């Protein structure tokens, strides 16, 4: 549940199961609200359905007074934020009594609700269009890579230590992380620093580095030369000794090949497995051309993503304007 319309679920219930249980039918269009773990997450029932005990259906007794979509917008925009007050803490859950007695729903006239819904739908349309554009641009990146392999390529095995330097970091204890540290520490998430420290594990940062997460969600990042970083034992790093290879291009292909291998939290991207990977690469000139084109596309994606980050607050502003 993530603000979407639900029409299909992983699990289904039979007619016999309905008769033996106390589940109640929830009508299409009803706002769905998560009760447990991911408290406050919302969705809309895309058709008549039943839910388990972790999901509440906010069924309306008087649809002449309240619009279903207005109710959804209140919760989905976090205008009514159930995550506040510690109710999203592990082991805690909401219940119907709390919703009935503690959650206050602002109820403007129906024509105001309609204005709110209409203005938020404009933002939702903008949001959807930008998400689709991001998808198109990501497909363009894939196409650029695929096209780069149409000519002459050479296969490089990452175990070739005459070309590649590959290693993993060292375990850090929490008390080694410093509030005033300057050097970012990377763990399984190679995009967001785990913390900061004031000592180095590696001594040479004169070459670009490619980082990958060993036992988290599969991800690969690229760091320019002269940027210090500290890898933990959940982070692998790769450096290239051959000037005929472009580090960014290698990073892109490593990410692609890692997906083929199915690296994940359970299928660890250990050094042995990484070294078994072969990467097909075109000439250095083509590598640089492709990287330059991809960087332009990535800049467009970043602009769109930044725009998307502003939309939730814009939805809140619509609600604040009328309420």
Language model features: what each stretch is:
Residues 33-34, 188:
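A generic structural signal for residues embedded in beta-strands
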């Amino acid at each position: 549940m993530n603000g979407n319309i639900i029409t299909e679920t992983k699990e289904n219930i039979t007619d016999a199961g309905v008769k033996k249980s106390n589940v109640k039918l929830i009508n299409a269009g009803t706002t769905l609200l998560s009760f447990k773990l991911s408290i406050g997450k919302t969705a809309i029932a895309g058709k008549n359905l039943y839910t388990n005990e972790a999901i509440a259906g906010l069924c309306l007794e008087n649809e002449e007074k309240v619009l279903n979509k207005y109710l959804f917008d209140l919760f989905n925009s976090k205008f009514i934020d159930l995550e506040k007050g510690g109710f999203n803490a592990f082991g805690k859950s909401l219940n119907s009594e709390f919703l009935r007695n503690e959650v206050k729903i602002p109820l403007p006239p129906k024509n105001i609700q309609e204005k709110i819904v209409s203005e938020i739908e404009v933002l939702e349309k903008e949001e959807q269009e930008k998400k689709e554009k991001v998808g198109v641009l990501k497909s363009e990146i894939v196409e650029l890579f695929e096209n780069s392999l149409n000519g002459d390529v050479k296969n490089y095995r990452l175990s070739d230590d005459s070309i590649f330097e590959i290693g993993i970091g060292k375990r850090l204890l929490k008390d080694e992380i410093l509030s005033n540290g300057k050097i970012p520490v990377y763990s399984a998430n190679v995009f967001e620093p785990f913390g900061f420290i004031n000592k180095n594990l590696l001594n040479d940062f004169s070459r670009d580095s490619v980082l990958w997460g060993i036992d988290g969600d599969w991800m690969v990042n690229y760091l320019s030369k002269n940027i210090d970083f500290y890898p933990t034992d959940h982070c692998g790093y790769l450096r290239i000794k051959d000037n005929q290879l472009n580090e960014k291009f290698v990073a892109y292909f490593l990410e692609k090949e890692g997906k083929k291998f199915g690296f994940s939290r359970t299928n660890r991207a250990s050094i042995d497995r990484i070294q078994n990977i072969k990467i097909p690469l075109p000439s250095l000139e083509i590598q640089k051309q492709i990287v330059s084109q991809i960087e332009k596309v990535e800049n467009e994606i970043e602009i769109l993503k930044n725009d998307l980050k502003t939309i939730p607050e814009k939805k809140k502003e619509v609600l604040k304007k009328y309420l």
